């Protein structure tokens, strides 16, 4: 409520003693319970108030001057003061003219001064504390001796503890799986041997001996019986038919020709030895 509204209200009713402004503050305070409008503005204007005056007296510290009649707290209050059910009036150093006006309630108070604030401010602080407890657990209880605040902190701890218990439970099953993945090497298709003949690591670093199956040997012998030398096209056809490589077919035919030549040489030598031994000059 601004001072403009108060001045217009007082100007509408000139008899200030008949229409009084009520103060619904603390009834046990030393200040008077009712104050008329003429007494409020007598020190401000210095004459009997009649009509509307739009001049506003301001303090040097803010928009609203001192001696505010609203709920709040005094800077001298400590965190350990006893809670009060009704709002507490606080006083600031006003200017030399002693003017007074109404001001809106202050911002919500921090956790340490919840005990000395009004019930509305306390509920706002509790609402913020419950919001913070969802994200972060309550570290330590408030420094005030308010019983409601301590119970609130216990609730915060009880709400935060299930969240902390669920996190290790959810991360526990993933740990053995990560360990098993790290210990077991992953085998890709290109790492597997397609054929036993493709092994390049021998006992002495040499190429391992190719072990042909019975069917492969029979087919190669048939082909060698008809052709001692193979063309490249025929070699590719045999390699696809027998699931072998062109190099293996070529090497097999080379070895087979060497063996055939060796057999023919031994046969010719035996025939020469047999014929030469029978001939005498």
Swiss-Prot record:
The gene is hoxa5. One of its GO terms (biological process) is anterior/posterior pattern specification. It holds the Pfam family Homeodomain. Sequence-specific transcription factor which is part of a developmental regulatory system that provides cells with specific positional identities on the anterior-posterior axis. The keyword Cell membrane does not apply. It is found in: Nucleus. Belongs to the Antp homeobox family. InterPro entries: Antp_homeobox (IPR050296), HD (IPR001356), HD_metazoa (IPR020479), Homeobox_antennapedia (IPR017995), Homeobox_Antennapedia_CS (IPR001827), Homeobox_CS (IPR017970), Homeodomain-like_sf (IPR009057). Residues 65-144, 162-183 are annotated as: Disordered. Gene3D superfamilies: Homeodomain-like (1.10.10.60). This is Homeobox protein Hox-A5. Keywords: Developmental protein, DNA-binding, Homeobox, Nucleus, Transcription, Transcription regulation. GO terms for cellular component: nucleus. The keyword Iron does not apply. Its main location: nucleus. GO terms for molecular function: DNA-binding transcription factor activity, RNA polymerase II-specific; RNA polymerase II cis-regulatory region sequence-specific DNA binding.
């Amino acid at each position: 409520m601004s001072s403009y509204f108060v001045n217009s209200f007082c100007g509408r009713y000139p008899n200030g003693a008949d229409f009084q402004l009520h103060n619904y503050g603390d009834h046990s305070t030393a200040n008077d319970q009712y104050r008329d409008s003429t007494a409020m503005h007598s020190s401000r204007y210095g004459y009997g108030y009649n009509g509307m005056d739009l001049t506003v007296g301001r303090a040097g510290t803010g928009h609203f001057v001192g001696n505010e009649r609203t709920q709040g707290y005094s800077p001298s209050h400590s965190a350990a003061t006893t809670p009060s059910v009704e709002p507490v009036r606080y006083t600031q150093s006003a200017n030399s003219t002693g003017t007074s006006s109404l001001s809106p309630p202050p911002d919500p108070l921090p956790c340490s001064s919840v005990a000395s604030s009004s019930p509305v401010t306390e509920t706002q602080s509790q609402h913020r504390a419950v919001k913070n407890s969802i994200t972060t657990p309550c570290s330590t209880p408030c420094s005030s001796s308010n019983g409601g605040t301590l119970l609130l902190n216990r609730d915060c701890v009880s709400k935060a503890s299930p969240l902390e218990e669920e996190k290790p439970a959810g991360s526990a099953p993933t740990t053995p799986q990560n360990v098993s993945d790290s210990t077991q090497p992953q085998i890709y298709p290109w790492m597997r041997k397609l054929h036993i003949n493709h092994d390049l690591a021998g006992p002495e670093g040499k190429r391992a001996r190719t072990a042909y199956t019975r069917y492969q040997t029979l087919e190669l012998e048939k082909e060698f019986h008809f052709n001692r030398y193979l063309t490249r096209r025929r070699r590719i056809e045999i390699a696809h038919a027998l699931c072998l490589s062109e190099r293996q077919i070529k090497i097999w035919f080379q070895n087979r020709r060497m063996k055939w030549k060796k057999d023919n040489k031994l046969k010719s030598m035996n025939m020469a030895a047999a014929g030469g031994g029978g001939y005498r000059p």
